[in-house]
């Protein structure tokens, strides 16, 4: 596996975002838990890897050699061609710690019986995505959470306004089914950050009787890699679940930061408001917490700032 990039330098950390829906036994999972933790410690990797009977989902950050070592170990237990991988770069470590966890699901929808490794929608490559979503007969759905959609989306996409992926099935039954019946679109197209949520969402829709269901292979991050900004249909930045908070179309850290009180992404304008106190409150949560909470948040922020100066 060649993970080198002629635009990178030794000063940058490599970030690998990956997933695979593949059937694993408990023996395989136990071996991977041991081996991945050892590799993370050996190479000083940071990030999170989730393992389940349905596959693997993770984002890790570290040196090129360290990231390569962990990915090669994973791929030894994967079927070739079923490993979705995106690489980006950051000048600072994107995570604070390294975790490998055994989970019931690698992306939690909360439903038993779904098997994306067997039943899944039609993959659409990034270079074909514009033609698909430009078609007025395509119903475009964002499968991410509401706070992610708030800072960037494909133009014309439906926002289910979910707080977590567990909410998606209820939205399908309460709103999407009647929407499809009324609009009779030729097809449904879905997308997410890296491809894993929209892939599982297509499996769910097909199980529930929906037809002509498509999803963006590799998600928004793959689209950023392969589609030029001049041709892009993307508006805004893409939220990511690490210290970078958001990425722009060049896959570089964007302008958003995170409110460590409520977890909402904040624009530069949000950060200039009188209601904003770093780590304590923002416009989204100014009336949400008690004075006791704010005292605790302020102390946590002080400790974080002290740690970052070391």
UniProtKB/Swiss-Prot annotation:
Belongs to the TrhO family. This is tRNA uridine(34) hydroxylase. The lineage of its organism: Bacteria, Bacillati, Cyanobacteriota, Cyanophyceae, Synechococcales. It comes from Prochlorococcus marinus (strain MIT 9313). The active site is at 192 (cysteine persulfide intermediate). Catalyzes oxygen-dependent 5-hydroxyuridine (ho5U) modification at position 34 in tRNAs. Signal peptide: none annotated. HAMAP family: TrhO (MF_00469). GO terms for biological process: tRNA modification. It holds the Pfam family Rhodanese. The keyword tRNA processing applies. One of its GO terms (molecular function) is oxidoreductase activity, acting on paired donors, with incorporation or reduction of molecular oxygen. NCBIfam families: PRK00142.1-4 (NF001136).
């Amino acid at each position: 596996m060649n993970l080198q990039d002629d635009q990178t330098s030794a000063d940058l950390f490599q970030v690998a975002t990956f997933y695979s829906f593949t059937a694993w036994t408990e023996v395989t999972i136990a071996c991977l838990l041991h081996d991945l933790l050892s590799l993370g410690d050996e190479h000083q990797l940071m990030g999170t890897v989730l393992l389940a009977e349905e596959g693997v989902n993770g984002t890790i950050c570290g040196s090129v050699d360290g990231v390569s070592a962990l990915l090669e170990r994973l791929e030894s237990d994967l079927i070739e061609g079923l490993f979705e991988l995106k690489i980006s770069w950051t000048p600072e470590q994107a995570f604070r710690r390294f975790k490998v966890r055994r989970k019931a699901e690698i992306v939690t929808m909360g439903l038993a019986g779904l098997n994306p490794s067997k039943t899944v929608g039609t993959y659409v490559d990034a270079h074909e995505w514009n033609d698909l979503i430009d078609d007025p007969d395509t119903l475009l759905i964002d499968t991410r959470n509401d706070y992610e959609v708030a800072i960037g989306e494909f133009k014309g996409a439906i926002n289910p306004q979910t707080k977590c992926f567990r909410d998606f099935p209820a939205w399908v039954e309460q709103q999407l089914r009647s929407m499809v019946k009324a609009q009779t679109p030729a097809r449904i197209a879905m997308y997410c950050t890296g491809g894993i949520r929209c892939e599982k969402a297509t499996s769910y829709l097909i199980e529930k009787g929906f037809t002509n269901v498509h999803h963006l292979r590799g998600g928004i991050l793959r689209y950023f890699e392969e589609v030029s900004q001049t041709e892009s249909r993307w508006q805004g930045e893409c939220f990511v679940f690490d210290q970078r908070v958001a990425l722009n179309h060049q896959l570089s850290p964007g302008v958003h930061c995170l409110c460590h009180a409520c977890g909402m992404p904040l624009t530069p304008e949000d950060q200039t408001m009188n209601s904003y106190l770093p780590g304590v409150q923002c416009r989204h949560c100014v009336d949400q917490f008690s004075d006791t909470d704010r005292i605790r948040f302020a102390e946590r922020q002080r400790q974080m700032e002290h740690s970052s100066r070391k």
